[in-house]
Swiss-Prot record:
A UniProt-annotated Pfam family: Viral_helicase1
Native source species: Maize rayado fino virus (isolate Costa Rica/Guapiles) (MRFV)
Protein name, UniProt field: Genome polyprotein
Family statement drawn from the similarity comment of this UniProt entry: Belongs to the Tymoviridae non-structural replication polyprotein family.
Taxonomic placement: Viruses, Riboviria, Orthornavirae, Kitrinoviricota, Alsuviricetes
Domain ((+)RNA virus helicase C-terminal): residue spans on this chain: 1040-1172
Amino acid sequence: MSSFLRGGHLLSGVESLTPTTHRDTITAPIVESLATPLRRSLERYPWSIPKEFHSFLHTCGVDISGFGHAAHPHPVHKTIETHLLLDVWPNYARGPSDVMFIKPEKFAKLQSRQPNFAHLINYRLVPKDTTRYPSTSTNLPDCETVFMHDALMYYTPGQIADLFFLCPQLQKIYASVVVPAESSFTHLSLHPELYRFRFQGSDLVYEPEGNPAANYTQPRSALDWLQTTGFTVGHEFFSVTLLDSFGPVHSLLIQRGRPPVFQAEDIASFRVPDAVALPAPASLHQDLRHRLVPRKVYDALFNYVRAVRTLRVTDPAGFVRTQVGKPEYSWVTSSAWDNLQHFALQTAAVRPNTSHPLFQSPFARLSHWLRTHTWALWCLASPSASVSAWATASALGRLLPLHTDRLRLFGFDIIGRRFWPRLPFHGPEPRFLWETHPACRPPVLFADSAFECQILAGLANRCSPSPFWSRLFPTASPPSWVAYSALALAAVPLAALALRWFYGPDSPQALHDQYHATFHPDPWTLDLPRRLRRFERESFMRTGSAPLPLSLPPPEGSLLPVEPPLAPSDPEPALEPSPPAASVPAPAPAPASEPPPSPESVAPPVAVVAPAVQPARAPSPSPALLGAELRFGDLPPVSAWDSDPEISKLGESTQGTVFAVTPGPRAPEPDTARLDADPSASGPVMEFRELQKGAYIEPTGAFLTRARNSVSSSIPYPTRAACLLVAVSQATGLPTRTLWAALCANLPDSVLDDGSLATLGLTTDHFAVLARIFSLRCRFVSEHGDVELGLHDATSRFTIRHTPGHFELVADNFSLPALVGASSVPGADLAEACKRFVAPDRTVLPFRDVHIHRTDVRRAKNLISNMKNGFDGVMAQANPLDPKSARERFLMLDSCLDIAAPRRVRLIHIAGFAGCGKSWPISHLLRTPAFRVFKLAVPTTELRDEWKALMDPRDQDKWRFGTWESSLLKTARVLVIDEVYKMPRGYLDLAIHADAAIQFVILLGDPIQGEYHSTHPSSSNARLSPEHRYLRPYVDFYCFWSRRIPQNVARVLDVPTTSTEMGFARYSQQFPFFGKILISARDSAKSLADCGYHAVTIASSQGSTIAGPAYVHLDNHSRRLSHQHSLVAITRSKSGIVFTGDKAAADGTSSANLLFSAVLLDRRLSVRSLFSALLPCCPFVTEPPTSRAVLLRGAGYGVARPLRARDAPPLGPDYVGDVILDSSAPILGDGSANAPQVSTHFLPETRRPLHFDIPSARHQVADHPLAPDHSACAIEPVYPGESFESLASLFLPPTDAESKETYFRGEMSNQFPHLDKPFELGAQTSSLLAPLHNSKHDPTLLPASIGKRLRFRHSEAPYVIAPRDEILGSLLYAAACRAYHRSPRDVEPFDPDLYAECINLNEFAQLSSKTQATIMANANRSDPDWRWSAVRIFAKTQHKVNEGSLFGSWKACQTLALMHDAVVLLLGPVKKYQRFFDQRDRPSTLYVHAGHTPFEMADWCRAHLTPAVKLANDYTAFDQSQHGEAVVFERYKMNRLSIPAELVDLHVYLKTNVSTQFGPLTCMRLTGEPGTYDDNTDYNIAVLHLEYAVGSTPLMVSGDDSLLDSEPPVRDQWSAIAPMLALTFKKERGRYATFCGYYVGFTGAVRSPPALFAKLMIAVDDGSISDKLIAYLTEFTVGHSSGDAFWTILPVEAVPYQSACFDFFCRRAPAQAKVMLRLGEAPESLLSLAFEGLKWASHSVYALMNSSHRRQLLHSSRRPRSLPEDPEVSQLQGELLHQFQSLHLPLRGGHMPNPLAALFRLLQQSSSLGPTYAVAPIARAPQVLPPSMADNATQVGPVPPRDDRVDRQPPLPDPPRVLETAPSHFLDLPFQWKVTDFTGYAAYHGTDDLSASAVLTTLCAPYRHAELLYVEISVAPCPPSFSKPIMFTVVWTPATLSPADGKETDYYGGRQITVGGPVMLSSTTAVPADLARMNPFIKSSVSYNDTPRWTMSVPAVTGGDTKIPLATAFVRGIVRVSAPSGAATPSA
């Protein structure tokens, strides 16, 4: 314990204690110390704070508990405010202090915390302060210290200085200010989850925690407080100190006077995300906010683009794509992500220009230094050279004026001689001598005179040679050019230095520093410089006379400057009038923690007209003024409220549809304001279709504009955004410039270019103008639907396709591919009618799309089961007249749902707030002819009665209105469900299945109102997902307004309303006698109803409207009433609400009802915040939409052309056109010696970051060739005679295939297909021997197998590792250590080099196991949005042929798990790393089959097995039986090898959180997870060593299969351990045991003869024997190569099958394959023949070659291989080998003894084997899976009592037709002729083939081709038919059919029509021909006999007259003619 007493070790000491009494005793003080802070935190911070903000608040010093429960619109801001008020400020208040701008209740809490808070001072500055402060203070602060709460941002330093001047005793102000520090450079928040803000002019709009209802506005200049160290006003100095920052909330201290130590300038730093700033682009300015990126992502991407071998253009974007969705990076802008990937892409090839040589001498080091520092040498040498050049030139210049007297060189006098002879005593003369004297120049006597120029100059020239006479003249000076030359020479080095600096290159050190500054910047910090400022004094109070301090008496006159009032106040008649208001009032202080009221409640500024100011001085305020409160006038009416800025006035969606709403009396819209201010426009603002009249197609021209002035616009032609003009020009031939000129001449500039023309392009609004000018009509085809715009009478028609951002001209018959299955859903006519419907008030229905709803049978089954059992609904109410029949109907419906398939219907959902008017437009829609066949379902009878009153139906139609139970028994085409969220869960699906006639469903409801709750405790309906979540995909818009609720309720709920009622909310102590009482509990409502009151429950009143006041009774149940039902209660009445009962239930306390309290106490709250979890994520509309406008926009591809064209073919794996950097070339050599590596250039962008893609560091091992493993001398086996065909004919007994199948949900499985299957060996197909698993042909395979193969968790909560799992896992680990002779306490150090090789091996396996095209097609497996714990389950396709499955029945399939690529790539190396150590430590007596061939297994058996009785074992549901103990066991294994903790935690997380498409799975083994085979094998080994004392007993293990050579003794502990395991053993004891499908024994291994015999039979019958013969022969040779001894390990019953297999191979195998049956080695001649074309070989084969073949192999070119060359790596590749043993695939080879195996692997690739070994591709049908089977996964059982099933026959092929090509030129000709007039006098029957019609024959005579586009028969009544209706039976058929008289309705499409009478007199009936069923070509190069034929029968009418026609029939249509024949047409 001494080590635990040192600091820092206490925590580890406590954690090391086991859960014993010692630990409990030691940790007792911890619990005691936590109790009080936890309780205090819960009391002080009770709000529910999201977990992502916990760490932020902890860093701010806020001690939150994390267990908060109370809801708050912005809890983090509230917590910071509370911390500042209750934890920080009380410590600053060391004396009496005043507090400003805080609510009285908060001040009371603050005062109770710190008594020094003496006074509260509040000023009402704006109207909303009336709700905050009950009164306005009339005095100024009177204490030395003042605390100003969240108001400093509204005051300037000059105003604060004025407060100090007004209060002389005031010394310091503690103030809190809410302002984002990043607003200094951006308008985008760095903490968007915490707050957002935006700029509006000089103001900043602050929005806390994503709650737009709580935003408020403050001046942007508030940021100056964070940038000020102090300020001076006049001669007074004030210091500003930043005490602390809590995110956007800052605490400041403002003091009077200069402190002794004061810094005028400093820097303030603020907390920001961990980010770096990207360098700005060259020569461009880019906002810093869009260059901030996360530092971790930047570092990872930097390394990624330099580590990948081949970098493609899309790789950085793919890497960034994996990070964009992470919530911690929500602060990063999309532009920053774009800049990051672009920066990484552009700079990927940049590397640091540094070197690290190893110097071998100082000279090398010096020379390298000189080469590196050339710039420094330049800088040092240039000044020296410049000085030297100047000195040299100057010296030479001084020599020029000297006169040379004597010059002697080499002893000879060159100039001058000695004047006296050389005497003997003279010394020798020097060999070099230069004697000079200064030259002279003429004196200056007379400037420029002839005397001076001629005489004196000549005299001086003559005297210069004489040293004596030259002294008489002045000394000559050097010429001036000498000085200039010296300066020029001195400037040369400096100029060279300047050029070197300008042209570069820079010094290596500078380049190095620039590289690191660019690519490795320092972390970005937000620093604001602070400095001293100077301000002018401003008035603190702008309300006329300033309040006075409490301690000062009111003076006689105010000497303070008078400022204009800040806000209007009530005038006092006793005072002088105040000066008029000169400015708009500044915003009032708004605390960050208190949400300001919604914008609707803010009144606009009211102009106050004040009388003229009197010159006299204003008198002193009277005592009445000091005691009065400043008040404001009444609030404006609700109609003047502003709308919520977050609620769009146009409900625009991403689908291209815009709902336009009728403008109300609101402020001008921005577009209107822009139009009004546009100088190029004139006239009023109106829609274009009103301005320019025309026959417009709705909704063409529905945009606002004004008339243009006479001058055309000067906006230039949008060259890069004119794709719409190009498309119109191509269609019409008009030049694009002409089209643009037309737009410029007709549209104002603000409409022509709204600011986005250059980037987003033209819109369909511009096309409307072109259509009006040039008479155009166009069909726009987009992925969201087709829309036709233009004029009805247009002269030009064409079609334009719109893709996002682009228009292009297409053919008129162009159409996008329809959604799969959408065209088969009926009700398309209803959908179109619903879209075209316009209500009487000119509004349209608020929905965007008609959705296709696919029913969920499980939900319907759940509800009908609960109804059947009496848990939900009242069956007696369904049909009160016959309750028994209703119950029978429900029971029948319950039975039908057991086998029902999902249905698809069309559906719209109108969702909106209570009273928004959802029912009223639907009631008018149901009156239209298309929707008259409807039925309405409502939750209550009250709502049913209201619907009847609304629609006033006829008596025969009242049945259409009913409750939800009775509606199930009715039938109609249209189903309307009102208050759908009040219905039971699953009602929508049940109602659709109950009525097969339903084609269209209309849902009405409000998701935030009450939902259905079953009253029976046994009901399972609540287990279904709620309706608001189930129906959310169908909510297109939410109608956020109300026509019902009064204004007071709307104000409280923050909801717009159109009601003019002011409303009221009051309390009454008595019940009303006539009003409706709403009660929470059903029992209370029943009691009041029994007493005669009209009382209903709140839940049952949902959907109802109360004209008078609603009486809400309060009781104890009201406190527990949900918010949804509380909202129902307060939104029923149109006039007001009266509360009765217990008033304490609405007193506003925490235990009271929140909504009732808010209404009664008039407290405002936000519905959008309160119900944010229930409201749909869709656009909100605040007014009824009035039209369906379509706005398409396109700019062409000039702005941003995509990398690939839209119609370009998909990229292939060999595409490298986007590779910009290729570093895959080897550094040294040609790469032939490197480890095999696959290029990753083809991988999806989101998968490449998961690959390290690094070359292997494994050195080349110089292995010696292995010695040849020659086989022993074996005796040739002798086989008893057995005919394969004879045995096969009797092998399969007579079998009823259907008796082996099973039924799942009424559908029979298909594991034994036998129909149309070929067979030749027996009486039936051999496929009946064993079940065939193929989900493509058996849709029940996977659903029926789920119950056996998968185990589900009860909820989405993770699986919890239980104590039992920990114990059992540790026991398994200890047993596994015993098996490998390890100590459980040993820990292997982590080897990073080996792990890197495992990563390479895993990546190589993943890249080579599938084709590159397959990997590219599976790009979604690396989708970052795919949760790693989400797994897709699918069935494994295989033919289960082994001894256990032969002659068996239905068998569950094996399930495979498809996991995210990241899981496989991260955890795969872990398993390979473990496998390396397992192979190293595995004892010789333990055999694991992975990585071994059957021949190696046979060798091991011969070496270790004995003739003893063996114990073989298998398990039932082995994967499903491994629970939490397996996870603990695997965790122990990874910890033993020191695997990084992150990988261990990831493995545990995935195992405990896995979920599938069928539901969440419990902890179990999944086939497909990394290391499935290894973990199964280890688990099996551990279990066997737990049960037995294995010791040295030989043990063979492979997955769940195992074999012991003999049964060891059982361990004593097994009896206690066995009950803890969930395993089911299948042990077999005997001398003949099988392992992995082989009989094994002391003589080797033999493939199980019955199983091999069955495989041969199946292959012969299905014709695939040619593909599988070599594989089966290889399996056979495993035992055959052992010689005659293998018979000792085969049971006697297997002998015939072994002989039959030998007989088959001898008679059917080709000669070259029979070589495999020979024992011993192959002859050398055969090897020579095989090695001729050999390019590579294994070591064993290489050892068998002769010298010539070895040289040939060594010098041959190496081909790429698909497997590693190292045998150890190949061995590590053998994962999941056991599963592959049973996988039946087309095989081409097998295993055989080494070296024969290698030899015949080469032979199989030889062309000498012939074409019989070619493998034909297998065509696979698409897989069909049910949607979800988790709940009914066990419905697999015996055959049902009834043998009814559906035999789905294939459809008949279409009849052959002559292919008609589309003509390039054609004419569409309309035609019409009258059939006859019908008088009714006699019956009529007529028919006609249109191809032989005289009218059409004449019309089509000049043409060779004629095609009917449309044809119909139209019947029109005549006036006499009013009293004599006449009936027609009409049908269209192919010409080959001729219906008899009156039999027209016996044919499909036949119709019976009645015309005339009082109803049908004014209608014309048309019967169109369905040309899809008939041949429309009535004339072609060949004749057809299936052209359209019409047949009509008309019975006689009583009283018919031959002269009085009753009706007339016409045939009319359109025929397309083409290919003129050229024949002459006779003239008329």
